[in-house]
Amino acid sequence: MLTRRQATSIFGATALASIGGLDVVPSRARAADPTPADLAMPGPLGDVWLGSQDAKCTIIEYASMTCSHCAAFHRDTWPKLKATYIDTGKVHFTLREFPLDPLAAAGFMLARCAGDDKYYAMIDLLFDKQNDWAFVKKPVDALAALTKQAGFTQKSFEECLKNQEIRAGVEAVRSRAGTILGVDATPTFFINGKRYDGEMSFEAMDKIIAPIVNS
C-alpha cells in the first residue's frame, strides 16, 4: 500500500488535499505563436497521435488532468470532434501534458504507464471521472481504485507513480510548453500553429477546422 508519507514524497502535500479546478499558472506576457519547428518537437516520452499524419489540419492540445475546463472539453466537445475529424483522417491530433499540480502529473503518469494504445482510454477515464478522484479528501486512494478499471493493480499503480523517468518526462513537456511556447493556461490549443486559449465548443472549432480541411 502507498502510505501517506510515500504519497507526499511523490505528489507533494497539495495533492493529498482536496484540489480545486485550477486552470492557470502565474501570468506572463503573451508569447507570439511559436515556430512550426518549436511546436513540432515532442517531449522525452514522445507524442501519442490520433488521426492521419497526412491530414491538412493538426491540433495540439495542452491540458491538465485536474482542470475542470479540460474535463468539460473532453466531455462536451471531444467525442464529436474525434468522430467528425480525427477518425475520418481529416485532423491529426495529440494531447500534451501540462499538469497544474502534482495530482494532475500523477494522472498523466498513469496514462503513460498504460501504454500508447491505451493512453487516450486512460485520459478519457480520468476526465470522465474527474470529480470522483481529483476533488476528494483522499485523491490518491480514489485514483488507485479508479485505475483498477484500466487494468492496474495496486503494485503496478505504485510502481508507475515511483517511475522517475516518466515523471521527469511529463514535467519536461510542461516546462517546455511554458518557456518556449508560452502556454500558461489549460486547455490551450494549437490548430495548424495558431494558438487558442480556453475550452472550445465543437461549433467554434468547426469554424476553424472546416476551411482548412476543405481547402
Where are these regions (language model features)?
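Structural alpha/beta surface segment adjacent to cysteine/selenocysteine redox centers
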Residues: 63-66, 71-148
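N-terminal secretory signal peptides and thylakoid transit peptides that target proteins
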Residues: 1-15
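C-terminal segment of N-terminal export signals and the immediately downstream linker at the start
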Residues: 22-55
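C-terminal cap of thioredoxin/glutaredoxin-like
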Residues: 2-6, 32, 64, 145-215
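Short amphipathic alpha-helical surface patches that mediate protein-protein
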Residues: 12, 127-131, 162
